[in-house]
Amino acid sequence: VYHGPGARSWEEVPRPELREATDAIVRVDAVTICGTDLHILKGDVPTVEPGRILGHEAVGTVETVGAAVSGVRPGDRVLVSCISACGRCRYCRTGVYGQCLGGGGWILGHRVDGTQAEYVRVPFADTSTHLLPPEVTDETALMLADILPTSYEVGVLNGQVSPGDTVVVVGAGPIGLAAIMTAQLFSPGHIVAVDLADSRLQAAKQFGADTVVSTQDSPESVVAELTGGLGADVVIEAVGVPETFELCARLVRPGGRLANIGVHGKPVTLHLEDLWIRNITITTGLVDTCSTPTLLAMLAKGQLDAGRFLTHRFGMDEMEAAYDVFARPQETGALKVALLREAAVSDGGAR
């Protein structure tokens, strides 16, 4: 439960109940923590009110459904998407679910109580959950709730990664690593990962980056050398601070694309005095999760190794410990953590 910037607690709350005919109540069997949750705790998302249960990623079992729900039934095992969609408004009809006008969008853990609980009320259950095939585990399915569709849609697709491209990913946290993983679906010529932490750079190498470079080692010079002075075709910002966005703008070539994924809590200077003449396309976006069915099919066929993101497991009642580990990745090596209803963890959560 969020209690204002810097304040959180794991506490007893009433079990959620159906409010609308389109709702489902889902027993949470596996849940994770997102970098956005850390942004909320910093106060970067002022629309989140104190008292809100956080979390927007979960896998669980349907307990009850409203009278209008026809796509899932009690007992079904489902992925709870980070984006809720009414399915009827102008945006939903064009697949832009993140901008839903009918009461959806990013609401879980934001405007309504979220998934970091034993049970969660899922609005618009027919369009906001996905049935899971038996060959996909709870832990791997968790990666489809947010980080994989976010990196794929907002980073790779918005950046229009194409065969032969030089792609730079600034920020090698879970979202950046997911961008590295999904960028490879389009056969880029070279992937460069930029980060401050050596542990994250090593992880980027394991996830498929061809070159890794510290932010302290002149990424501009490295990219210039790799591209014959042109700059990168695509630069993906996966941090969310002014300095990294401005670095991305310096790394992209004239005519290139800068795709911002990072959640920004402070104003960023857009240097149009330099950019106006360079024909650069800059995209931003909230994930729509329109790619989730495609990614789920790939995961079921073994074409995406989503389990690589999971570094720590906890029991559901170890939420405070999980947050502490996830918030200190340079010390703990955490990428993604999973909190499991049936977990029997006695080693501090490490896999």
Task: Identify the function of each model-found stretch.
Residues 88-170, 307:
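NAD(P)H dinucleotide-binding glycine-rich loop of Rossmann-like/cofactor-binding domains
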Residues 134-217, 221:
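Mid-domain Rossmann-like dinucleotide-binding core that forms the NAD(H)/NADP(H) cofactor-binding site
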Residues 158-162, 186, 202-281, 346-347:
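Glycine-rich cofactor phosphate-binding loops and adjacent beta1-alpha1 units
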Residues 195, 262, 286:
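Conserved acidic E/D residue at the C-terminus of a beta-strand in Rossmann-like folds
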